[in-house]
Amino acid sequence: MTPDHGPLLYEGKAKRVFAADQPDRVLVEFKNDATAFNALKRAELEGKGRLNCQISARLFEMLEREGVPTHYLDLVSETWMLVQHVDVIPLEVVIRNVATGSLCQQTPIAAGTELSPALLDLYYKDDNLGDPLLSESRLQLLGLISSQQRLEIEQLARRVNQLLLSFFESLDLLLVDFKLELGLNSAGTLLVADEISPDTCRLWDHRNSDPQARILDKDRFRQDLGGVIEAYGEILKRVQGV
């Protein structure tokens, strides 16, 4: 079902954002598009938008119950979500609990190494620049956020990490790493925005020891492992308690 909505405000790789009936709200439609490597790899996967929308809704609801402010307001349909309008901070906050992926390519840290405390990195959100990693000095040079906002972002991200780690662990899932996008609402409150889904989280299945079969996230698409929709569907089943 497509809800009544205003004009298209923005279209990204995985979602479309439309005006809603109030200026401080927007409607988000989750698409079936799958992309990787800054959209150099593309495909359309039937059902992906529905799965990511519903997984994100359940995870936002869990965070809200735990007192974490998010932009989420309501699940309007299987693929549409009503959220607060936010001014997105142009940073990707990446938290790593286990070393894998680019961290192992860029450092001598062995894949599978548990990271305690979790590693928190900030990346400048710009596809044209390849979303570069920002040092503290470069962050100050760009003037994207104040020192106080930097502290608030780290505190919020680490709180989200602890909640998601515990929640996924209760579902026999390991949260390897994930990215967060944050924004400020009309009152200036820092909120978790965008989505939290297998597109943005690496999730490994504790119930499966096979190094490929245990992958239940976007790496199945990145690495041509197949079974992307089945993996996302398994995440939704567990998140919903089915």
Curated annotation (Swiss-Prot):
Alphabetic keyword roster: ATP-binding, Ligase, Nucleotide-binding, Purine biosynthesis
Record-linked InterPro entries: SAICAR_synt/ADE2_N, SAICAR_synt_PurC, SAICAR_synth, SAICAR_synthetase, SAICAR_synthetase_CS
Protein's GO biological process: 'de novo' IMP biosynthetic process; cobalamin biosynthetic process
One Pfam family in the UniProt entry: SAICAR_synt
GO MF, any single term: phosphoribosylaminoimidazolesuccinocarboxamide synthase activity
Pathway participation: Purine metabolism; IMP biosynthesis via de novo pathway; 5-amino-1-(5-phospho-D-ribosyl)imidazole-4-carboxamide from 5-amino-1-(5-phospho-D-ribosyl)imidazole-4-carboxylate: step 1/2
Family designation: Belongs to the SAICAR synthetase family.
Full protein name: Phosphoribosylaminoimidazole-succinocarboxamide synthase
Gene label: purC
